[in-house]
């Protein structure tokens, strides 16, 4: 498996049900993909059997379904895939009979605050939040205007005083979240402003906010800031493996097979007509891919497709 997000983890679990062993690679420092790295505490409401579940709990549950012998290699970006008579060789080291690519939106990194900062300032500028409680009883600035910024501001407001700064008067996120923010007494909305300068003064971040249009500039002081300008995602490296892309996504057939026999894909990395980017859909695609692999590797076997077979 290439990708240790929710779809890659579930693919390894489903492979185990069919007697297949898996090795999982991920370029990130820890398992879980975007749910773990980008919104670990956000409630996800479109996973079957859960009214809601946060990203961390979802990943923990998926990890608990893996057999003990499943090996996961993090901090490793697969650079090379070669096909031979026995299957595939990844980075001239690992031999695999088949491959499932489940890299989601691809390798991603945050869009950074476009200001020059000294090291002692950068330590107080965050692009990922693991635990909102770490910001308890502090003055926090949140920069951004999309759903991620709104979600972060709402969650942080449970523990801290928050000011959310956006360059437009209108937010791009859900109106329900905007109304929620406006109802909180410890949240202040500052629009339309852009950050112009940042300094560390009296152990606080002193930020110059440039007013847009005829709005006057102002200074704000924070203990820490959180930047939610979005992320740059890139799947173009997959093309180096000889995989056919549809834009930046992998073109697959109904069995989740790519243009290369033995290489499959599942999750948000794939493209086909009518697809919607849902984790739950990726789980089903992983099951299709594993079932297809079993039929390729063991054509003589009669498969038990699912655990509810009678």
Swiss-Prot record:
Cofactor(s) essential for the protein: FAD
Gene3D superfamilies listed in its UniProt record: FAD/NAD(P)-binding domain
Coiled-coil regions listed: none
InterPro entries in the cross-refs: FAD/NAD-bd_sf, FAD/NAD-binding_dom, Fd--NADP_Rdtase_type_2, Ferredoxin-NADP_redctase_2
Signal peptide: none
Cofactor binding, per record: Binds 1 FAD per subunit.
Documented EC number(s): 1.18.1.2
Keywords: FAD, Flavoprotein, NADP, Oxidoreductase
Similarity field: Belongs to the ferredoxin--NADP reductase type 2 family.
Subunit description: Homodimer.
PANTHER family named among the record's database cross-references: THIOREDOXIN REDUCTASE 1-RELATED-RELATED
Protein name: Ferredoxin--NADP reductase
Natural source organism: Lactobacillus helveticus (strain DPC 4571)
């Amino acid at each position: 498996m290439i990708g240790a997000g929710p779809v890659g983890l579930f693919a390894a679990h489903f492979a185990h049900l069919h007697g297949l062993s898996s090795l999982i690679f991920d370029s990130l420092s820890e398992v879980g993909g975007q749910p773990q790295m980008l919104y670990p505490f956000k409630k996800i409401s479109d996973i079957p059997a859960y009214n809601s579940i946060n990203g961390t709990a979802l990943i923990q549950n998926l990890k608990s379904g893996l057999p003990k012998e499943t090996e996961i290699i993090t901090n490793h970006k697969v650079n090379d895939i070669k096909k031979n008579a026995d299957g595939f060789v990844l980075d001239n080291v690992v031999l695999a009979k088949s491959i499932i690519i489940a890299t989601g939106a691809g390798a991603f990194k945050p869009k950074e605050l476009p200001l020059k900062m000294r090291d002692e300032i950068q330590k107080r500028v965050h692009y990922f939040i693991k635990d909102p409680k770490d910001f308890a009883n502090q003055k926090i600035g949140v920069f951004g205007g999309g759903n991620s910024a709104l979600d972060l501001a709402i969650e942080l407001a449970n523990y801290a005083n928050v000011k959310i700064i956006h360059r437009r008067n209108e937010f791009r996120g859900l109106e329900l979240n905007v109304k929620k923010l406006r109802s909180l007494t410890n949240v202040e909305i500052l629009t339309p402003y852009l950050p112009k300068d940042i300094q560390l003064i009296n152990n606080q971040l002193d930020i110059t906010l440039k007013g847009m249009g005829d709005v006057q500039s102002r200074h704000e002081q924070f203990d820490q800031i959180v930047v939610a300008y979005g992320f740059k995602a890139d799947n173009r490296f997959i093309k180096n493996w000889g995989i056919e892309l549809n834009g930046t996504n992998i073109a697959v057939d109904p069995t989740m097979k790519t243009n290369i026999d033995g290489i499959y894909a599942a999750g948000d990395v794939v493209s086909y007509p009518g697809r919607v980017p849902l984790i739950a859909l990726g789980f089903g695609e992983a099951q299709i891919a594993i079932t297809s692999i079993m039929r390729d590797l063991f054509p003589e076997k009669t498969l038990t497709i699912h655990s509810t077979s009678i």
